[in-house]
Every structure is written in structure tokens, then in C-alpha cells.
Amino acid sequence: MSEVLPAGLATTVLVPASSANLGPGFDSLGIALSLYDEIEVNTTESGLKVAVEGQGAGEVPLDGSHLVVRAIERGLAAGGAAAPGLIVQCHNKIPHSRGLGSSAAAAVAGLGVANGLLAKAGRAVLSDDVLVQLASEFEGHPDNAAASVLGGAVVSWSETSGATPIYAATRLDVHPDIKIVAAIPEEQSSTAHTRVLLPQAVTHVDARFNISRVALLTVALTARPDLLMTATEDRLHQPQRASAMPASADVLAYLRSQGVAAVLSGAGPAVLALTTVDLPDSAVKYAEDQGFSLVAMAVSAGVSVR
């Protein structure tokens, strides 16, 4: 039976955006980015109040179906607790439906809130492994969720031997010379919409190509950033998604033509540039002329709770 937490507990969570795939690492590689949603939560005697400002305001539900609320409840249940009532305030900076992990961030934020409340009540908190598992259950894949939990870059995987998939990840420390720039358009795109564009089968040649590139990318991210251009080549999902987001495909191709290791961020439409030098002025102008906002980011250390 769950213990009902007292009213008057408060916690604040800062959760980072993330980018998945990074070119060849489809549904397995991710990286945490220094763009954050901040969630403030108080326990009350009863009821639920949800407020959202910034990204998603006026678009997301303000009741118990809100993903942050569902994740809070799931995390508390995993910790053997429940809240009598909640005030949830979301200050969102992560753009929605752009390929920057906004839904994974919401799930991780809610679980982080649960950990904060459990800690304030003197109860054991959930481990990082449990956070990755629970957040990935909301997502259906672990790449974004694991990055937001663990920070840095992540290699993630799943095992499906039982009824419930087991999700796991390990962190990679990103080379300090690597700089990240996100090119973010106004248009939105959902993962579900672009995932249906992917073929059910690929050739052995293309599979072998991507295996070599994703292995190389783990080296490029951690020790050899000079290999990023080759390491970010992909044949499994970016070419297939190009028709659904021609502007993103165009910007990605132009950046790569200028020697910039650019990839589609998750399912897009944002484009991520991984580089050790500033972007060429011509690349900046080209992306901005196509309606993209360029945002310089660092690698995040992951979710923080206070």
C-alpha cells in the first residue's frame, strides 16, 4: 500500500533537451543538450493544479493526462508513495515536436519530481537505472530519455525477452572540444509521422555501413572529434525522412557540403551540427535564410533535482 506524502513538500527539477540518433545511431545514441524545462511542484491537501508557460502553453492538457503529472504519479508509485494533491508549474524552453526530446524531458522531469518529493519525505529515491527504465516506458525507446537522465552522450539498448521491455543505457563523456549548434525551424513534426516512412527491411550493405559508422561515432564523440564527418553518415533513416521535411534535408545537406558534421535531430525537423570550430558564416546565413533559428548549446550533465 502506498504511503500518502504530507502536504507542504516542494521540489524543483531542471531537465535537459536531448537529440537522438546523431546520424547512424538510430534508436540507440543520444546526447543531452543545455536547453532546459524547469518544473516546480508542491504537494497540497488535495486536488491538482497544472500551469504551463513557454513552449506548449495553450497546447498541452492541464489535468491528470499531462505527461509530467503522469510521470510524477508513476515515479511515486514506484517509490511506494502517493501525493494527496499537487501544484505543478512548468516553465518550458524545449520546443515541442522539433526532434529535441520534449516528451522524454517531460517524462524525466516528472520522475525527477517524484524523486525530489521522496527525498523530502525521507524515503529512498529511485536509481538512475530505474529512471531510465520508467522514462523509456513512456517513450517506447530509451535514447532521448536516457540522455536526459544521465547527461553526456549515451549508448542505449532494450531487451525484449519478457512481457515488458527492459531499457538500459551507459553514458559517454563527450570530448570537450565538441561544440553543438541546433538549427530549429518553426514547423513541427511528430516521430510517429516520420517513423512510418522507414522501410521494414534494409540491405545487408546498408546495415553494415551504419554499424561501422555508429561504432566510429562513439570514438569520435569521446576521443577523435576529427572523425565526426565520416562518423555521422547514415543510410537507415535520414534519407527516408527527407521527403517529409525538405527544408531540413536541404539545410542538413548544405551544412555537410561546408564540412560541418550535421545530422537530423531525432525525427526532426531540427538539425544538429557537431563541430570543433564555429560554423562558417555562409552556413549560418543559409540556415537562417531557410527560416531556421540557430542556437548554440553545450552538453548537459543531465536532470537535476533540488
Swiss-Prot record:
Major subcellular location class: cytoplasm
InterPro entries named in the record: GHMP_kinase_C_dom (IPR013750), GHMP_kinase_C_sf (IPR036554), GHMP_kinase_N_dom (IPR006204), GHMP_knse_ATP-bd_CS (IPR006203), Homoserine_kinase (IPR000870), Ribosomal_Su5_D2-typ_SF (IPR020568), Ribsml_uS5_D2-typ_fold_subgr (IPR014721)
Biological pathway: Amino-acid biosynthesis; L-threonine biosynthesis; L-threonine from L-aspartate: step 4/5
The enzyme's E.C. designation: 2.7.1.39
Classification via Gene3D superfamilies: 3.30.230.10, GHMP kinase, C-terminal domain
Binding site for ATP: 95-105
Catalytic activity: L-homoserine + ATP = O-phospho-L-homoserine + ADP + H(+)
Keywords attached to this entry: Amino-acid biosynthesis, ATP-binding, Cytoplasm, Kinase, Nucleotide-binding, Threonine biosynthesis, Transferase
Subcellular location: Cytoplasm
Superkingdom, taxonomy of origin: Bacteria
Major enzyme class: transferase
One Gene Ontology cellular component: cytoplasm
GO biological process: threonine biosynthetic process
GO molecular function, one term: homoserine kinase activity
Database matches in NCBIfam families: thrB
Functional description taken from the UniProt entry: Catalyzes the ATP-dependent phosphorylation of L-homoserine to L-homoserine phosphate.
HAMAP family according to UniProt: Homoser_kinase
Family of the protein in this entry: Belongs to the GHMP kinase family. Homoserine kinase subfamily.
Name of the protein in its database record: Homoserine kinase
Organism (species): Mycobacteroides abscessus (strain ATCC 19977 / DSM 44196 / CCUG 20993 / CIP 104536 / JCM 13569 / NCTC 13031 / TMC 1543 / L948)
